[in-house]
Amino acid sequence: MIYEFGDFALDTRRHELRRSGEPQHLEPQVYAVLCHLVEHRDRLVTARELIERIWGHRFITPGTLNSRIKALRRALDDDGTTQRVIQTVRGMGFRIGVDVKARADPPSALAIGGTSQQIRFCRAHDGVRIAYATSGNASGSPLVKPANWLTHLEHDWNSAVWRHWVSELGRAHRFIRYDERGCGLSDHNAGDLSFDAWVCDLEAVVDAERLERFSLLGISQGCAVAIAYTVRHPERVDKLVLYGGYAVGRNYRNQTPQQEIEGSLLRNLVRVGWGRDNPAFRQVFGTLFVPEGTPEQWQWFNDLARTLPMENALSIMEMTHGIDVRPLAVALDTPTLVLHSRGDAMVPFENGRMLATLIPGARFVPLESRNHVLLETEPAWAQFLEEVRGFLGGA
């Protein structure tokens, strides 16, 4: 999205503020403050809300936020006296004081490196057709993302939730991702939706692309698939990046009574409301995946959910609850980076920490976010990119 006000344009896809077309330097936290204020320009934003959005669970003094507001005003040719752009409501918070026009990215902006994604199909060991896509830097080292719950190659490419992942990770890498069996453009009547079948699907995709050596990016349940594949084929995996993942599903966790009720409630929500025209049931998942998202992003989750049959959604969810890769994780001998959001509502932080303790030599990076899928406007996304690029060696 591009937000225009006066001589300025805030481009959230490019993570950039421009003045009369020229990029302006902003520190990550200052940029995040601007994004949040602009995205919620129709109302007052409290200081507490900004602090929770930018710094998460860390303790900061009011002076820290005020210094970021001051830096933002300087960048916008504003000041605390005139408050032309950023207005302070004493004792309450801040709001945008100028008219802001929002427009979607031009279609060409969704192309990566001037090209679109290339979608192809391959067959898994049991004949199921798996849809996969390649995009990004064709001459870069391969980076493969094992599938996670709820994907659709075409839908994700244009989404307000995933497109910055695809574009940024494709800058330095030939980025390869696929729809898991039962989802998206892959066969929906797959029959076998077991964990072993998921690993075999990853094997089919990398073999179809004739990849000899590559890195894996596991997200959520994709972390377990990446681990299992690496143990089977250690000679083919260069490095492992695991974000928002876990070694054990809900069935093997020491859950509180409240967490057990939550798990049962989510399963029943899928059974009862997944196929209904009323989106209320499906929107629960959107707010769990991206609690700090916008209505547009929650609507995207609702639209995505409608592409997946209820029976498949439930079967895949129940299979994720039965995951246990602890014996495989301790057997890894591959450089591994583990990242996890402290406030993740879908996969609690402790699961990521435990995963990192199981993998020999793994480095663990906590991220200050409540989102299971990082959004492009939050500081945690910039930190994620910096850590991953430094680890993989990409620009």
Question: Model regions: which residues?
Answer:
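DNA-binding patch around the recognition helix
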Residues: 2-4, 10, 24-25, 37-42, ...
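Short beta-strand/loop motif that positions the catalytic acidic residue
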Residues: 332, 338-340, 344
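Flexible "cap/lid" loop of the alpha/beta hydrolase fold
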Residues: 227, 231, 238-271
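Short amphipathic alpha-helical recognition elements used for nucleic-acid or partner binding
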Residues: 22-54
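Conserved HGGG/HGGXW glycine-rich cap/lid loop of the alpha/beta-hydrolase fold
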Residues: 124-187
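Catalytic active-site module of serine/aspartate enzymes centered on a nucleophile-bearing elbow/loop
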Residues: 362-395
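Conserved acidic catalytic loop of the alpha/beta-hydrolase fold
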Residues: 196-214
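Conserved alpha/beta-hydrolase catalytic His-Asp/Glu region
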Residues: 274-319, 327-328
